[in-house]
Amino acid sequence: MNLEVVAQLTVLALIVVSGPLVIGLLALRKGNL
C-alpha cells in the first residue's frame, strides 16, 4: 500500500472515531444525555 493511501485511511478513521467522541463530550458538558 502507498503511504498516501495509508494516510488517507488514517485521516478517515480519525474523523469517524473523533466525531461521536466530540458529540459525546459536548453532550456531557451541556448535561443533556
UniProtKB/Swiss-Prot annotation:
Belongs to the Psb30/Ycf12 family. It is a single-pass membrane protein. PSII is composed of 1 copy each of membrane proteins PsbA, PsbB, PsbC, PsbD, PsbE, PsbF, PsbH, PsbI, PsbJ, PsbK, PsbL, PsbM, PsbT, PsbX, PsbY, PsbZ, Psb30/Ycf12, peripheral proteins of the oxygen-evolving complex and a large number of cofactors. It forms dimeric complexes. Its main location: plastid. A core subunit of photosystem II (PSII), probably helps stabilize the reaction center. It comes from Zygnema circumcarinatum (Green alga). GO terms for biological process: photosynthesis. This is Photosystem II reaction center protein Psb30. Keywords: Chloroplast, Membrane, Photosynthesis, Photosystem II, Plastid, Thylakoid, Transmembrane, Transmembrane helix. The keyword Plastid applies. The gene is psb30. The chain crosses the membrane at residues 5-25. It is found in: Plastid, Chloroplast thylakoid membrane. Pfam families: PSII_Ycf12. The keyword Nucleus does not apply. One of its GO terms (cellular component) is photosystem II.
